[in-house]
Amino acid sequence: MAATLGQVLALVLVAALWGGTQPLLKRASSRLQQVHERTWARQLLQEMKTLFLNPEYLMPFSLNQCGSLLYYLTLASTDLTLAVPISNSLAIIFTLIVGKVLGEDIGGKRAFAGMVLTVAGITLCITSSVTKTQGQPSAL
C-alpha cells in the first residue's frame, strides 16, 4: 500500500512532536524537586501533582501526547512499514536538533553524519512509497 503525501507529512509532524519535546521534557523534569512520601501510592500522587502543576513540563508533555494521538490516527490508513521508520527515525533527528538548539552536546561530526544517513534512508523509504498522482507509484 502506497502512502499519500498527506500521510507522510502527518508522520513527519508526529516525529517533530515526539522528538522536539524530548529535550524540553528532560530539561523540565531535571529541575523538579524530589518528593518523598511514606507510601508508594502517596509518592505517586505527589509526583504526578508536582509534574502536572508545572507548566514548563506540562506544555511539552501535552504536545508529545498530541503527537501520539496523531500517530494513532495516521496508523489507521498508513502502512506500518512506512509509518514506523519515518516517525521513529525522524524523532531521533528532531531530538538531536532541538537538543543542539538548547545547548546540549549532541556528539559532533559522527552524530551529524548519522543524521544525514538517517535522513537519506528515510527519503529513500518515502520516495519508494509516496504516490505522485492517483494510482501511480513514484519512480525511484
From Swiss-Prot:
Similarity-based family: Belongs to the TMEM234 family.
Membrane topology: Multi-pass membrane protein
Gene: TMEM234
Chief localization: membrane
Domain of life from the UniProt record: Eukaryota
Cellular component per GO, a single term: membrane
Ranges that cross the membrane: 1-21, 82-102, 111-131
Protein name: Transmembrane protein 234
